[in-house]
Amino acid sequence: STYASKRAAMHPRPYLNRAESSFGGTNDLAGLPATLDIKQSPSWLEHVPGYSNLQKNSSYPSGHTTGAYSWGIALAGMIPELAPQIMARTSEAGNNRIVLGVHYPLDIMGGRIGASAQNGQYWHNEFSSSIVPAARQLRGYLTERCQADEHGSTLAACIANVKANDAGGYTNGFLDSVASEPVKDQASAVRVYTARLTYTFPQNTSQSGADFMAPRGAADVLRLAYPELHACLLYTSP
């Protein structure tokens, strides 16, 4: 849940007049414009965007992004052969929130970080009891479907035969002012996902050159992808 984080941040949504959104205190815009040129999506049949429902809901962090990454990271960890495509698709859920005008890029980054921390903790605590059985069940089901459709006797063979980890897998050619590169193969999926890790935010210069340190449990998400590596190596691998 992002409830506690949102209550602590209490940052107005980007489509609101930020000069009027002080939440009981001062609101120094630091030279930024009070309003942005955001065109709200209109209601259409049963689709109601619900902008008014979010006026008192903090933009940071993005709850939708947190939910998407919570599932996406878990799925990528269980099927690491397709992790680049899975994570690129996951990143689109957050990117779309920027396009809708209901979140800032930093909100999306916060949602991803929160979901990553949640996954790390869960994989660390429940790896043997929940993660391994779930991964075995999922991979077994996919293998059975591959065999039934005559795409290969193993999951690896199936992925290779249908080119699921390349041009035959997930693609998305849609572009907008936020999504500037199409996903057309594994290499582009990696680039798109990597770009959305920071949205061009510069690195904190005070942290430049600092040694990488993974949070406790974070490396456990890689255990199925790299079972042969010692845990100490995972904890020191960016």
Residue ranges and their predicted role:
Residues 1-12, 16-19:
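Phosphate-/polyanion-interacting regions in eukaryotic proteins
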Residues 11, 19-211:
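Membrane-embedded catalytic cores of phosphoryl/pyrophosphoryl-handling enzymes
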Residues 235-238:
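Conserved small/polar residues in nucleotide/adenosyl-binding loops
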